[in-house]
């Protein structure tokens, strides 16, 4: 103000600037009023008092929002919107930038959806804080203020500083949280927010709103989001443990009827908001149900179909299922009558829990006649099928051509939008490319099929172009249908759909009625069954990997039965990996005609996944809406030579110890050469066995050493089951085997040196001696021996202590695996950690997202 007093002519500019600096539609409105008032008065006019501009409004950095109103205290908010203590309470978090712009339709929508389902809501809005600590009042402090409370005095406001000083003391008002924020929730206060989320122990959902992709473009796109948007919309929130990235609002343009100005505002996508609200409701239901009331579906992998194929990547699935059943029983779940051993469980699963291929109708009848096998009335499935989006239905019944036909019809509703039109063309091109790629796997029909696919693509592009330019679409539609009929007459397996419900996959007839066979076993409130097969015709592998062919009716029916008839409160997929997260359509930001979303339904999904399966695990989180609970890899050990390789090593050892003058030297050399020829390893090490020399013996020995230093898994891991000390020692030894040369030596290099050996020139015999001593010393350390009693080498002692620490983390993982699963089934929060194999990320171990 002193500046204005000195330069009064700048007063109007400063007044306008204050409105702008404080932001928000109400301030912009009053800024415009002030501008008009000054202009009117300067030109001799009068300004009506009803239009007098208000003073600039400063919004607080911590507030609650509802129905267009802002509240600065929880007491004030609860006076207007009291909580029902018998119902779940959902927190909502968003930045003040959208409130300042008056663009809160997405907030209003999710509040309406949640309250319509009987849930309480506490909608928090806070300021952004860029650099940690520069803005003490912000979205993070707002969440602390409105979501936490002092158990001794619930009405007292808790500050962020108080909370951080004693996080274990405070309690929480919410059962779940919805985040509308991109990048990180809590803005600059990343670590503090991470601690808050972990302590609240509630699921945190990612409700995505886009500023770049309109609804039509999103619906028609094949990627869902731009790859650059995926980073800040999904990947960054995932690092905070935020789950289920669901696309709920898009920008929509409208023209103001008074001014003619184009207005862009967030518009909720109502069916997506409903979907999010249903999923939130089912997650918090896990908190409110007692364990005896909960129904759980355990889903394992049976590929290819048949009795001998129950498994997952490096996981002992039968033993894992038994351990999970025991844990559920101990936790009070209604589960009984299950086998006590994995062998007995396998017998039951191979009798009643397998998929049966269409070429084995006799086996299907045997399965259908088993006691307690589930036969789902095809009419009930048909009723469920009719609830699916018409695009998905058409794709199942008629195949990929029916799908692309319906997509173009959808595109006609958005053809005036440049971005939607481009998305439709891109989807057409990708569809064409994928169709031709699949057609090429059938050489006898590939050429004819490829021509027709290209013709259909061009006809559909002409439909879109004609509609966009106001021309008739009749002719290109007619061309398309002619090509479609000709294409379908080729009868290329997988391309013509699965026919009308219920199809012919795993269906039987009883007394004139059709039924779909749902393989699986029920133990009380726990259903155990195989994920259905992705494809059934001709070459199963082709359809398994297809991105254009819909899953069969029985596949959809199986998931529909689990979600709606058995009415599972949660799905638990066991091991890497299932197929539902790989089904056709969008890469991320799925819609209601994307099959992964259809199969996930609205029920919570927990996925037991190997800790090093990072890339594929992302698919299960983003497309399968799964919460991952990692499991350890099996123990890893250096490779043991066997058979002829072991004999070869012995020959080399004998040869190296034989004096050069001995007549046996040449005989041993010839024996080594013959063994190299027998094992056919000469090409691998680039030697010529017809001209075998002493130098080649050294190359063969180096090859054997390389094999012995290669890590390999030992058996399979059983989820939640502890290892022996020997197995823990093997993995700990593998972790400390990473060698950076003399400047950053591995434990094995140091031990080799202590034994008087050159680590870079170890023979196969020496390599085995070094590996054995390494594991033995670590085993002794695990069992309580002090490293100093084994060696006085400071570097070895340091690495032995490090190995002991890794062994501790490994042992912690076993109990944490099962505890994390049970916590997820209680509607809890699974803390995120970066994944990878234990060798690269020894501190990651397992049990995290």
Model-derived features with residue positions:
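Ligand/cofactor-recognition surfaces for anionic moieties
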Residues: 1-849
